[in-house]
Amino acid sequence: RLGPLPLDRDHVTALLPHRPPMLMLDGVTELIAGQHARGFKLLADGEPWVQGHFPGNPVMPGVLILESLAQLGAVLALATEPLDPARCDFVFLGVDKAKFTRPIRPGERLDLDVTVLQQRGGTWKLLGEATVAGQRCAQAELLTAILPRQPSPPRRES
């Protein structure tokens, strides 16, 4: 279902519901179901956050680093559980022990690593680490869950 490693952006897009500009994972390079995954995000000059965070000194927002790690965690969960990605969502429940130790800038490759600390039912506790050129930029424990997808309420026309 996942396809052979490495998974490219097309494979990631087939698994996750996220689309640009919120698709924060470009590839998966290593995956051991139920245990660990590695992936990456290539940061372009045209990323939506570049102009405003911060003008003249762009730095990737910490929440987007965490989102990148969570998306890699979702791929790991889909490799572990017999789930249909079209019928479930992988959602954040909480973040603990988040540390941001180095700014991440456009033009860099953000390497991502998630390890399962605990899994119970559809709830996952992951240790995530983000690095650039081998230097740790961020680390956090992510509490996530797999939930059945709910139909979207109908949109009201104005």
Please name every model-derived segment:
Residues 34, 64, 68, 123-125:
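An amphipathic alpha-helix/helix-turn recognition signal
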Residues 59-85:
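Active-site helix/loop of acyl-thioester processing domains in fatty-acid/polyketide metabolism
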